[in-house]
Amino acid sequence: MEEALKTSHRAIRSFVLRQGRITAAQTRAVAEYLPARQIDAHAEWRDPWNNQRPLMLEIGFGNGEHLAAIAAQRPTWGCIGIEVHTPGVGSLLLQLVEAGTDNVRIVHDDAVTWLKTLPDAILRCIIIQFPDPWPKKRQQKRRLIQPDFAAVLCRLLQPGGELQLATDWADYAGQMLTVLNATPGLQNADADNGYVFRPDNRILTRFERRGQRLGHAVYDLCYRRIP
């Protein structure tokens, strides 16, 4: 996913754009199926479902496994996914076509820049799973969850809407808690302002199951938008 985090001097990206290997099937899927399912990040916002559905957003959907599953579980919702890496977009499209799922739209562009252009309080749920942890100390300014970005996420949520996050890096989880607990308008779903159990709607992906086999702990966070 492509994020630009502003500092006082210049924009700092929270990603490195590595396209990686893309299969022939993914390439065809992007060419054939993306145009009908794409949201133009450079155009004025228009709700793809004409304000008739609650909207869920997943930022950085990776290979699309989680987004495809949750969209199938919530057929009456409008599900939007943001991902900068083309192989992941192709992978998601293949899953959607195979399942016949038609309630997903895709932003294949810079997430932070696009989110800043959206009107207030349009989203019922925002999901961010396993963002790049940037583990080295000199890299941590690239982490996605920073105060300015947290304020944007809060602004986009409807009152009562949820922000759900997960990471398997303890240090990053602690930073998320610090930043989000201090964000006006967000209330931690945990009474002690700590971590929560995995939400029922969060599907275990192959990535997470592999981490569990390796003994990686996963930290879940959940926040609600308050007036």
Swiss-Prot record:
Q: Which GO terms describe its molecular function?
A: tRNA (guanine(46)-N7)-methyltransferase activity
List, alphabetically, the Pfam families matched. Methyltransf_4
Q: In which pathway does it act?
A: tRNA modification; N(7)-methylguanine-tRNA biosynthesis
Residues at the active site:
D132
Residues recorded as binding S-adenosyl-L-methionine, renumbered to this chain, are E58, E83, D110, D132
Has UniProt tagged this entry with the keyword Transferase? yes
- Any one GO CC term of the record: tRNA methyltransferase complex
Q: Which residues bind substrate?
A: K136, D168, T205, R206, F207, E208
Identify the keywords attached in UniProt to this record, alphabetized.
Methyltransferase, S-adenosyl-L-methionine, Transferase, tRNA processing
Catalysis performed (reactions): guanosine(46) in tRNA + S-adenosyl-L-methionine = N(7)-methylguanosine(46) in tRNA + S-adenosyl-L-homocysteine
InterPro entries xref list = SAM-dependent_MTases_sf, tRNA_(Gua-N-7)_MeTrfase_Trmb, tRNA_methyltr_TrmB_bact
Q: Which SUPFAM superfamilies match?
A: S-adenosyl-L-methionine-dependent methyltransferases (SSF53335)
Q: What is its EC number?
A: 2.1.1.33
Keyword S-adenosyl-L-methionine carried by entry: yes
User: What family is reported?
Assistant: Belongs to the class I-like SAM-binding methyltransferase superfamily. TrmB family.
Q: What does this protein do?
A: Catalyzes the formation of N(7)-methylguanine at position 46 (m7G46) in tRNA.
- Protein name in the entry: tRNA (guanine-N(7)-)-methyltransferase
Q: Which organism is it from?
A: Acidithiobacillus ferrooxidans (strain ATCC 23270 / DSM 14882 / CIP 104768 / NCIMB 8455)
